[in-house]
């Protein structure tokens, strides 16, 4: 059964990770020794709790960004994603292919002369239903 971690343990381990991220590892014993060197912690029990939570957070950081911890590497990655500009726009409107029904609706609204709107070349075919087996539990045509 898990234990409740106090605010002191959580805050101190977050601060230690932010400041000494390059030294911290995924190993509890190594993190405990690092905490001994870099922080003044009054008791052995509290030091072990902080080292344990720091190890837990380091494992979570490996998987992705963790709320409450601001690392330079993560901030740079986030900025890179925000500044990304695609080569080709996703909302390119040079040519829009619509079916006959949509074209009729546009003409009813008086918007049939929009630039770039063209009728689709071929009508989409209706998909034939596959035979179902058993009691029809959504098996997508599986026999077994």
Swiss-Prot record:
- Could you tell me which InterPro entries the record lists for this protein? Ribosomal_eS17, Ribosomal_eS17_CS, Ribosomal_eS17_sf
PROSITE patterns, from UniProt? RIBOSOMAL_S17E
Gene Ontology terms: biological process: translation
A GO CC term attached to the entry: ribonucleoprotein complex
Gene3D superfamilies linked to this entry: Ribosomal protein S17e-like
Q: Which SUPFAM superfamilies match?
A: Rps17e-like
Record keywords: Ribonucleoprotein, Ribosomal protein
Q: Which domain of life is it from?
A: Eukaryota
Q: Name one GO molecular function term.
A: structural constituent of ribosome
Quick check: keyword Oxidoreductase in the entry? no
Q: Does the keyword Ribonucleoprotein apply?
A: yes
**Pfam families xref list:** Ribosomal_S17e
Q: What family does this chain come from, according to its entry? A: Belongs to the eukaryotic ribosomal protein eS17 family.
- Which PANTHER family does the entry mention? 40S RIBOSOMAL PROTEIN S17 (PTHR10732), SMALL RIBOSOMAL SUBUNIT PROTEIN ES17W (PTHR10732:SF26)
What name does the UniProt record give this protein?
Small ribosomal subunit protein eS17
The source organism is Solanum lycopersicum (Tomato)
């Amino acid at each position: 059964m898990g234990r409740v971690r106090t605010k002191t343990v959580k805050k101190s381990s977050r601060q230690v990770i932010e400041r000494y991220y390059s030294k911290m590892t995924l190993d509890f014993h190594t993190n405990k020794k690092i905490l001994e060197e870099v922080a003044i912690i009054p008791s052995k029990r509290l030091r072990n709790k902080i080292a344990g939570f720091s190890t837990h957070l380091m494992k979570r950081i490996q998987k992705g960004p963790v709320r409450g911890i601001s690392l330079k590497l993560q901030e740079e990655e986030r900025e890179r994603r925000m500044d990304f500009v695609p080569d080709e726009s996703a909302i390119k409107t040079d040519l829009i292919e619509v079916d006959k029904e949509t074209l009729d609706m546009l003409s009813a609204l008086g918007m049939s002369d929009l630039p770039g709107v063209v009728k689709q070349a071929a009508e989409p075919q209706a998909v034939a239903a596959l035979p179902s087996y058993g009691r029809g539990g959504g098996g997508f045509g599986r026999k077994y």
